[in-house]
Design a protein with these regions (language model features):
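A short acidic, amphipathic alpha-helical/loop segment
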Residues: 60-64, 169
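Acidic-and-aromatic substrate-binding clefts and catalytic sites of carbohydrate-active enzymes
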Residues: 54-60, 129, 158-161
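Short catalytic-loop micro-motif centered on adjacent basic/acidic residues
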Residues: 48-53, 151-155
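Catalytic pocket-lining loop regions of alpha/beta-barrel enzymes
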Residues: 141-170
Length: 170
């Protein structure tokens, strides 16, 4: 299944076992469905959750805020950048200070300028761990150190995602 393929009857079995293979399975763009899921979470005793999407996979942060308000569940947002393949154009030339400035701006002014401030930093690392991703990882670690926010690293789930390299850098 290719990453740009849509969910179909022909590939649904593969996708159910490997739901990260296509962007279509990760597109949570129906606030009503999302709100029901969060309400079910609350009914099961949940009180807080971390919404871990960052640029590259981030949805509508305003909808997330509305869902949190409507359900009474605390939702902690996240800043950072996802895997290389999903990077916004500016990231391809960014240096450590640029990544840090981006994260600090979201921390201080809110995610995408909304005033909704993140409580965590997340970095996605691709298979093969590119040099630019190392810059991003170092920037995220420094930003976490300076701000006191927790850092989550999402290494590639296939072989070659670099967890040992990541640990050495951190």
């Amino acid at each position: 299944v290719g990453e740009d393929e849509k969910n179909t009857l022909e590939n649904i079995g593969i996708i159910r076992r490997n739901n990260m293979f296509t962007w279509d399975t990760q597109d949570l763009d129906d606030p009503a469905v999302m709100e029901k899921e969060v309400a079910d979470f609350k009914a099961a005793g949940g009180r807080s959750l971390v919404e871990m999407s960052v640029p590259g996979i981030r949805g509508d942060i305003r909808a997330v805020k509305t869902i949190a308000q409507n359900t009474g569940v605390n939702v902690i947002g996240t800043t950072g950048i996802y895997i290389y393949e999903s990077w916004p154009e500016w990231c391809h030339e960014a240096e450590i200070k640029d990544f840090m400035n981006f994260m600090k701006q979201e921390i201080e002014e809110g995610i995408e300028g909304t005033g909704i401030r993140p409580g965590m930093i997340k970095v996605g690392i691709s298979s093969g761990f590119r040099p630019r991703e190392e810059l991003l990882l170092r920037a995220a670690a420094r930003t976490a150190n300076e701000t006191g926010l927790s850092l989550t690293v999402h290494p590639c789930f296939t072989m070659g995602g670099g967890p040992l390299e990541i640990a050495k850098i951190l």
